[in-house]
Amino acid sequence: MTHDAAIGRLIKARTISDAWYRGLNVIWNHGSLITDERGSQIREFMNLMVVIEDPYSNEIPEDSAWNHERLEEYAKQLITGENAQDFEYTYGQRLRNWDGKVDQIEYVIEKLTNNKTTRRATAVTWVPTIDTKVDEVPCMIIDDFKIRDDTVHLTTLFRSHDFAGAYPANLYGLSKLLEYVADKVGLAPGTITTMSVSAHIYDHDWDKIEKIIKGVQ
């Protein structure tokens, strides 16, 4: 049995910038054209896995619309759970106050501190009692932390991933979250791996991304 859908690719990247450009290239050149449930045209590559060896060098792609100030604010919201702009929810709120009851980041830190080989240092953003009833739901679903060789590694699952618009900010924020957790555990931060079930580029970004892809090929 064969399938026309573009599914499955592993990218081993050195930095966040390297990951972004290489991911865009895969989606642009090998992705499928689909119309999503909101009627938007996208280029999509399913199950795109990216391993970033050094998330702390060359963090901001020069072609990204994100600047350092905006990225720092994004990272702050992710780590602290603050919602100064009164969004319907933030990832930080889901991680630090899941369903109004659980600080999952403190749970992760405790698990890692108590057992360096634990496979239970996992945080989730999906709240079924809320997210099955609304349209605006989290794209980032799971953050899983593991200690291997005295280094803390992070693996994150995105059910849906706006690779052109959001990936640089997502990874900058995740790098700061990993750094925060590793510091609390007393170890060095390591790699970040993202699994994007639907890695896509929206049609409103196509002209810009086409120029970027031509410039880096």
Swiss-Prot record:
Its EC number is 2.1.1.-. GO terms for molecular function: thymidylate synthase activity. Keywords: Cytoplasm, Methyltransferase, Nucleotide biosynthesis, Transferase. One of its GO terms (cellular component) is cytosol. Gene3D superfamilies: Thymidylate synthase/dCMP hydroxymethylase domain. The keyword Glycosyltransferase does not apply. Pathway: Pyrimidine metabolism; dTTP biosynthesis. The keyword Transferase applies. It is found in: Cytoplasm. One of its GO terms (biological process) is dTMP biosynthetic process. The active site is at residue 139. InterPro entries: Thymidate_synth/dCMP_Mease (IPR045097), Thymidate_synth/dCMP_Mease_dom (IPR023451), Thymidate_synth/dCMP_Mease_sf (IPR036926), Thymidylate_synthase_arc (IPR014620). Belongs to the thymidylate synthase family. Archaeal-type ThyA subfamily. May catalyze the biosynthesis of dTMP using an unknown cosubstrate. Monomer. This is Putative thymidylate synthase. It comes from Methanococcoides burtonii (strain DSM 6242 / NBRC 107633 / OCM 468 / ACE-M).
